[in-house]
Amino acid sequence: MAGAKEIKTKIASVQSTQKITKAMEMVATSKMRKTQDRMAASRPYSETIRNVISHVSKASIGYKHPFLVEREVKKIGILVISTDRGMCGGLNVNLFKTTLNQIKNWKEQNISTDLGLIGSKGISFFRSFGFNIKGQLSGLGDTPALEELIGVANTMFDAYRNGEIDAIYIAYNKFVNTMSQKPVVQQLVPLPESKDDHLNERQQTWDYLYEPEPKALLDSLLVRYLESQIYQAVVDNVASEQAARMVAMKAATDNAGNLINDLRLVYNKARQASITNELNEIVAGAAAI
């Protein structure tokens, strides 16, 4: 059994670590709530644009934007959104497994894949697999800005326009609640039909006067909408990261508390044994006299 002094030093070390994990838990909680506010603020914007796109695309008779046209799929581009930092449990690992499984399914259908990567964890992971990486971005921080994402987004959009890829998907961790984050791989381009499109079609009995013409407006709206979808996915992923980190740090704090209690018990036993030995020595010495 270790001496009482060594155990006391160990207790102090674990207490110091516990303070750090508790602080990280509180910081993650605060950041998660702020990110949830950004998520809520951005949703009405993208939903409104989607409704306008639905109406304008029906008004643009004789014109089909490339982002709305299905074509034979031979190669798919996936934009994978991961974190820049660790200590968030299995968040990134679960996303990477889901993405690789989807890539495997496409490969069985003779469909190849190119990647666009956001987040240093994803960059370091997928580089080792030898994928063709169209673009990458890291260092977004906790408050990502849309302007920072446009470069990677346009790289994927240009590849689609030029026929280098036939569809674009986005992989990220969808924030469900504090305790649950779901890795998803969903289609971005061609723009999948929304469930609300048919409802809007039945409800709208009026038409609009478009300035400029519907074609030019649709071109602009589609790019803005897709950029907003990527931004929404990044914000979702940040919220998932902070939630996962909060849970991981809480578990670490609780485990540290349990370890401290165990060490204190061992310390008390060691101290008691030391006192008992000293008493025995005193008694033995007195008996010898």
Swiss-Prot record:
CDD domains the UniProt entry points to: F1-ATPase_gamma
GO molecular-function terms, A-Z: ATP binding; proton-transporting ATP synthase activity, rotational mechanism
Membrane topology qualifier: Peripheral membrane protein
Subcellular compartments: Cell inner membrane
Keyword list, A-Z: ATP synthesis, Cell inner membrane, Cell membrane, CF(1), Hydrogen ion transport, Ion transport, Membrane, Transport
Gene Ontology CC annotations of this record: plasma membrane; proton-transporting ATP synthase complex
Protein function: Produces ATP from ADP in the presence of a proton gradient across the membrane. The gamma chain is believed to be important in regulating ATPase activity and the flow of protons through the CF(0) complex.
Family to which the UniProt record says this protein belongs: Belongs to the ATPase gamma chain family.
Descriptive protein name: ATP synthase gamma chain
Organism of this sequence: Haemophilus influenzae (strain PittEE)
